[in-house]
Regions:
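Short glycine- and hydrophobic/aromatic-rich loop-to-beta-strand nucleating segment
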Residues: 123-127, 167-169
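Nucleotide and nucleotide-moiety/phosphate-recognizing core
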Residues: 1-121, 151-162
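Conserved alpha/beta core of the MobA/IspD/sugar-nucleotide pyrophosphorylase nucleotidyltransferase superfamily
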Residues: 137-194
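Alpha-helical elements of the RecA-like P-loop NTPase motor core of helicases
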Residues: 7, 48-49, 133, 167, ...
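A generic structural signal for short hydrophobic patches within well-formed alpha-helices
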Residues: 98, 131-135, 175
Length: 194
């Protein structure tokens, strides 16, 4: 999901430089090769062009609401057993966490799966097929969390240790904080290779 307007950020955060590449590249990497179908739903022409260069399917739209983004994306994925809604502004989400969510879903495909840190649920959220009708008919402006909240008995969480994985970069300050963590981790990785 890459359809936010970036009002609090003050611009197109998806294309903001995150360690030498657009921030959206991080979420594309975290989901690469894991799904039969992958689709970026966005209002950003720049993000759409970047995805096309990487051969990632894109649905470019101009609709204003989160419920519109969910509906458009799910409509394109309706023949799947499950659908992962991943915000594109969560740059520290890892491939390992997304892979673990998929493994959990394979063990219990009737549950709504989401990561949680210290008991606090976050995104992305993996929805099973039974929830598609509710997602397609979300109240105006609501997102998938609305469906999860309506079915708390069917929500399962995957514990993650790093709370930064679940953080959004909604403001320039949050972006700078997450970028700093990313760059420090990259430096540590580089020093281990020496």
């Amino acid at each position: 999901m890459a359809s936010g307007l970036g009002r609090r950020f003050g611009g197109n955060k998806l294309m903001a430089d995150f360690g030498g590449e657009p921030m959206i590249a991080q979420i594309l990497r975290a989901t690469d090769g894991l799904f039969e179908k992958r689709l970026v739903v966005t209002r950003s022409e720049e993000a759409a062009a970047y995805c096309r260069i990487l051969s990632v399917d894109v649905l470019l739209h101009e609709l204003p609401l989160r419920s519109d983004t969910v509906r458009l994306g799910l409509h394109a994925m309706r023949d799947t057993d499950g659908c992962l809604f991943t915000p594109a502004d969560q740059p520290l989400l890892t491939l390992e966490t997304v892979s673990a969510l998929i493994r959990c879903f394979c063990e219990d495909s009737s549950a709504i799966w989401r990561p949680a840190c210290d008991g606090e649920p976050g995104s992305p959220v993996l929805f099973p097929r039974w929830s598609y009708n509710e997602l397609l008919t979300l109240p105006e402006g609501k997102g998938g969390g609305y469906v999860a909240a309506r079915h708390p008995d069917r929500v399962r969480t995957l514990p993650v240790r790093d709370p930064h994985e679940l953080m959004d970069a909604d403001t320039p300050e949050e972006f700078a904080h997450l970028l700093s963590i990313h760059l420090n981790a990259a430096r540590k990785d580089d020093s281990h290779e020496l």
